[in-house]
Amino acid sequence: DIVEKDPVKTSFERWAQPGHFSKNLAKGPSTTTWIWNLHADAHDFDSHTNDLEDISRKIFGAHFGQLAIIFIWLSGMYFHGARFSNYEAWLNDPTHVKPSAQVVWPIVGQEILNGDVGGGFQGIQITSGFFQLWRASGITNELQLYCTAVGALIFAGLMFFAGWFHYHKAAPKLAWFQNVESMLNHHLAGLLGLGSLGWAGHQIHVSLPINQLLDAGVDSKEVPLPHEFILNREILTQAYPSFAKGLIPFFTLDWSEYSDFLTFRGGLNPVTGGLWLTDTAHHHLAIAVLFLVAGHMYRTNWGIGHSTREILEAHKGPFTGEGHKGLYEILTSSWHAQLAINLAMLGSLTIIVSHHMYAMPPYPYLATDYATQLSLFTHHMWIGGFLVVGAAAHAAIFMVRDYDPTTQYNNLLDRVIRHRDAIISHLNWVCIFLGFHSFGLYIHNDTMSALGRPQDMFSDTAIQLQPIFAQWVQNTHALAPGSTAPNAAAATSLTWGGSNLVAVGGKIAISPITLGTADFLVHHIHAFTIHVTVLILLKGVLFARSSRLIPDKANLGFRFPCDGPGRGGTCQVSAWDHVFLGLFWMYNSISVVIFHFSWKMQSDVWGSISEQGVINHITGGNFAQSSTTINGWLRDFLWAQASQVIQSYGSSLSAYGLLFLGAHFVWAFSLMFLFSGRGYWQELIESIVWAHNKLKVAPVTQPRALSIIQGRAVGVTHT
């Protein structure tokens, strides 16, 4: 039996007691530190109990809670689309009407923020990409958005119920959580395989015919509703004739009959500037097949298929000792180790997604909505950055809390830890090399520019440093369609090269992105900042348990301020502090990436094209020359772009000016926590408490300055 019935009583009285999960915190506050510890430890299930089964159940229950919150959030997005948006007006004229789903109430003149977005609608322009996603899904009216919003709330309720049910009524036993083969099969075949198949089915039966009609200029009110396509095959055959043949071509393996709705064209739809939706339907069907096969690969009840333990233990090379022996035990008993790997993979994938959003814009009219393109790129870069740093955080927690050196001898993990000095010192050298050389190229250019010697600068018009390997990769992909798949008419992305340019309503959706000296320079800044981030995070993981400075670090835990009194120079060495510093460098990395993307696209891709074919880019193609100096970045990018926001007061853009101001206030607030020491605040607090005592209004809970760790946490959060 894999389920335990009624393991934990449902008690509202217990839940109402703050800190009920911890013996110490349940006693209540003596100082204000209590409230911070409450926040820090509420979800640190390791600190509640040592029982791995109970910890696993809590994590499992929390996942349902997380899903419920996501459903509520999604419901809100869809509800705004239904109640406060100009979706239907946008749908009928997406090139002139801007998307808006937020209206500011007219309290003391705030209606100035509601600009005219077109279609007779006043509101704040949104940049989330939901309109484009809804159009691609085949949503044609606001009632459908209402229904989806209600459906999402119902699902949120189900998720909350499931979270309670699987912790309090029928909780899985530890063996269920550790049955990795079954979990792999179900997640691969069910979640990814059937999930992709369901989406492919929706695309084929609902989205494709609706989008085909919309592309042809049919009014959204005239388009048949989704159920009409599903119930009436005649309407479908008008859009895609092969539907008349039913499933006969499928079972006779004559699959090419379906090539009217399952295509492999490449490039973009010239009407919408998005990927061909017939390509994406084909893609999801193919992905579904792959994952359905993958979901039958692992050995469970019938003695056939792969065993994860066998794969890991066989994974050893001539120079790697015991290889991955012992890793199976780690990954089935340490959820931190499991999470670290998943976060690293998902973080990398999210960053890849951010690049696909502009190189292969997946939804109709997304590529010509520049503000949304910028927002989606930024969003996915940031999320990816957080996930990668989170991977290092949980890897370090694993090292401190879950790693048992006695069971890991001479396997890959042990060997990496034993030669950590070589790894970190080499990585440090790489960072120094990249930092001095990449920055040095810019300093050289600034100096030559200041001295009036443009011929001695590194640029496309003087001393060229062309990214030849990147150009070779681009060229290979640009030439691929002719020699790879039979029906591929264009490259996977038109950014690779060639002469194709897609414009929608005179606005450029995509064009080849040529790389030159300016990109070569900033690329090495990317390499530098990313390597420094990795250096800090990896050092935190590899030295989480011990170092020459603090040999017994593992005993001090994941986060600690210093190695006790009398040991000066041992502050800020905990694994937590490495995550803290790693976050700052992750921010550094992403800032440069977003600057590069934003300027490059405005300079070389985005803009307008006249009927005569004359192209006008937003910043007039100034990236290649201006971005080769630090001064160019400051003057022609940062100031040139920020000045519009700073001067936006009194117009409907002032919301962005206020956000810009507010963001800088939040940032300055963070520095207050990072630049002043704990003792400063403790001294100040005690003086204020003295004054309260004089007036006999002193609180029972003794006020106390934030600990060093807490102060830095507040600081990094607001940075």
Curated annotation (Swiss-Prot):
Membrane topology: Multi-pass membrane protein
Binding, chlorophyll a': H664
Gene Ontology molecular function terms on file: 4 iron, 4 sulfur cluster binding; chlorophyll binding; metal ion binding; oxidoreductase activity
Catalytic activity field: reduced [plastocyanin] + hnu + oxidized [2Fe-2S]-[ferredoxin] = oxidized [plastocyanin] + reduced [2Fe-2S]-[ferredoxin]
Sites where the protein binds [4Fe-4S] cluster: C562, C571
CC terms in the record's Gene Ontology section: chloroplast thylakoid membrane; photosystem I
EC category name: oxidoreductase
Cofactor note: P700 is a chlorophyll a/chlorophyll a' dimer, A0 is one or more chlorophyll a, A1 is one or both phylloquinones and FX is a shared 4Fe-4S iron-sulfur center.
PROSITE patterns xrefs: PHOTOSYSTEM_I_PSAAB
UniProt record, GO biological process: photosynthesis
Keywords, comma-separated and alphabetical: 4Fe-4S, Chlorophyll, Chloroplast, Chromophore, Electron transport, Iron, Iron-sulfur, Magnesium, Membrane, Metal-binding, Oxidoreductase, Photosynthesis, Photosystem I, Plastid, Thylakoid, Transmembrane, Transmembrane helix, Transport
Subcellular locations according to the entry: Plastid, Chloroplast thylakoid membrane
E.C. designation(s): 1.97.1.12
InterPro entries from the UniProt entry: PSI_PsaA, PSI_PsaA/B, PSI_PsaA/B_CS, PSI_PsaA/B_sf
Keyword 4Fe-4S belongs to the record: yes
TM spans (from-to): 59-82, 145-168, 184-208, 280-298, 335-358, 374-400, 422-444, 520-538, 578-599, 653-675, 713-719
Predominant subcellular localization, coarse grouping: plastid
Annotated chlorophyll a binding sites: M672, Y680
Residues reported to bind phylloquinone: W681
Function: PsaA and PsaB bind P700, the primary electron donor of photosystem I (PSI), as well as the electron acceptors A0, A1 and FX. PSI is a plastocyanin-ferredoxin oxidoreductase, converting photonic excitation into a charge separation, which transfers an electron from the donor P700 chlorophyll pair to the spectroscopically characterized acceptors A0, A1, FX, FA and FB in turn. Oxidized P700 is reduced on the lumenal side of the thylakoid membrane by plastocyanin.
Family: Belongs to the PsaA/PsaB family.
Oligomer status and interactors: The PsaA/B heterodimer binds the P700 chlorophyll special pair and subsequent electron acceptors. PSI consists of a core antenna complex that captures photons, and an electron transfer chain that converts photonic excitation into a charge separation. The eukaryotic PSI reaction center is composed of at least 11 subunits.
Protein name per Swiss-Prot or TrEMBL: Photosystem I P700 chlorophyll a apoprotein A1
